[in-house]
Amino acid sequence: MKPIQKLSLFRLLPLSCVLLLTACTLTQPGGTGSADSPQWRAHTQQLQQLNQYQTRGSFAYLSNEKKVYARFFWQQYHPERYRLLLTNPLGSTELELIVQPNMTQLTDSQGKKYFSDNPEEIIYQFTNMDIPLDNLRHWITGLPGDAKNFKLDANYLLKTVNYQQNGATWQVNYQSYDTSTTPALPNRLELIQGDRRIKLKMDNWTTK
């Protein structure tokens, strides 16, 4: 694998991009649904049948050490294969990640390609961002992934997820859903681990 250089162009992204993350959306209702309910089981079955989908929107990674704002495009074209694209406000590609079983390809803004068998490791080495990609691909659709500790809202949709990974606890907060899609899909969520926060706002979804 080629030596990996730290990505620096993200530092140039303006703070104003965070405004894209605060657009008006329908917030979640209060209350807690049961994870044993037929409504939740039916919803998870619908989500698990989404083998192909794509979404785009705003991405923010905030920590004491760095602040990154970008646009993202996520394309899932198989249960175990996906493509993640991060672009700057001018639309230029900063990073492309293509993930499939036992193979991850990362392409930087100069078109150089790097390979690994671990997507979380290669994106951390390249950007110094700790992103739980293995579970994020489930969380982004509203599934708990490997987490066993989660709560539902009154509509039997995920409200919070708590997941431990390598001694660290990630908390996922679902702030709103797009109910115009079938099944309903998240359009705002936040991941928190220590001083790290990852914010995602999905502008739209395309499903098959």
UniProtKB/Swiss-Prot annotation:
Residues 1-23 form the signal peptide. It is found in: Cell outer membrane. It is a lipid-anchor. Disulfide bonds: none annotated. A lipid is attached at residue 24 (N-palmitoyl cysteine). The keyword Protein transport applies. Plays a critical role in the incorporation of lipoproteins in the outer membrane after they are released by the LolA protein. Belongs to the LolB family. This is Outer-membrane lipoprotein LolB. It comes from Photorhabdus laumondii subsp. laumondii (strain DSM 15139 / CIP 105565 / TT01). The gene is lolB.
